[in-house]
Amino acid sequence: MIRKKMSKQKGVTIVEFTLIVLAVMVLIIGVLEIGRYVYSLQMMNEMTRKAARLATVCYVLDQHDIPTMDEVVETYPADFTAENLVIEYLDSSGNTVDLTGYTSLSLEEQSSVFAMIRFVRARIDNYQYRFFSLLSFIGTDGLLEMPEFQTTLPAESLGVVRPREDDDDSGVIIDC
């Protein structure tokens, strides 16, 4: 009778081990994926900081070039594009300064618009993080809308070097 019972239990240990290993592996992969998500959050924070910093010292017409600069691109998370990073110039009230048609304005009008800029904001727009297939039940098909990230800094030179009497190269616009 004892032999009969023992023969029915052969292989049970390997089945239990397989189930436990499977559960542990799913847990480890889930923890790694959540860690990758949190790392992407930090990368986006750093990306907006770098982009805002560059925008404070680059000329206003370079605002569409900043998201493609190497300093910013190196911090892109997976599936991020330059269109997801928006650079905006703000007046003293925090309202966006409209720069459309800036190059077609007269020098006086350009100076007037330029003088309104007090802050620079870099923000993430419409970026969705994609989880790997293991966590694809999170969000919509594994896509999760990222929280709003933005960095606002006071405007500095905005790419314009002030003229000095002892330097012939000063008073020019520096292209980033």
Give residue spans per PLM region.
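Short, conserved structural patches
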Residues: 54-176
